[in-house]
Amino acid sequence: MIDTLMVHSVSSSTRNNAQKYSHNSIQGHYHSIFDIVYAADTNQIRWSMTVGTLQDPHGVAARYGEGIILKRPILGIGVVLGREGNYLVISDLHIPYHHRDAFDFLWAVYSYYDCIEILNVGDVIDHHAGSYHESEPDALSSEDEYYQSQKYCKELQSIFPEMTITEGNHDKIPKRKLKSVGLPASMAYDYNQMYGLDKGWKWTERHSFDSKGGQPVLVPMVLNKRGRWDKRVHGQ
């Protein structure tokens, strides 16, 4: 039975998501939200999980929201523990502006929880140079960012050849830019082709699946004083 929905963004309130839907839900997008909320009615108990981010909090692309004290990014990901296997839920990476230890962290969590399937809430790629927000002057050029994104996406695909991704607003920037100049968004319909990737990554607006009674776990990426991952898997 399909019991869980993953989308890039529902709302900024995980509690509202849990109360609103008749199924479990997973989202990303909100970098400063890292929580799980349960809700119940006479028929069932359900949960909603928001999984933070893996974007480098001190990187160029994170500078836009750096001064908002109450919206500091929380580094981490999610795991859904199912009766027949566990699901790794990757948070917003914003390649090539992801944290330098993000891929090592993902592999460690994947191995620790012995995950059978890889899910990704979206914003895999940042597209900073093409953003509708003002770009930082010391950011990569659009050409350099594109080639760096290709490089890191290929590296991530070598780690996780198969992945289901719900498209994020940053992933969609090329489509949005095409529409802005009067061209059809369908010209950028194939993200895998755009970034030279194999077909093992499936991109979709939303993903519904049977978690087999899955329960959510948040796994924070804890940094040491030097800003590097502490090499430990912390579950909560």
Feature map (PLM): residue ranges:
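Conserved beta-sheet core of the metallophosphoesterase superfamily
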Residues: T4-V79, K212-Q236
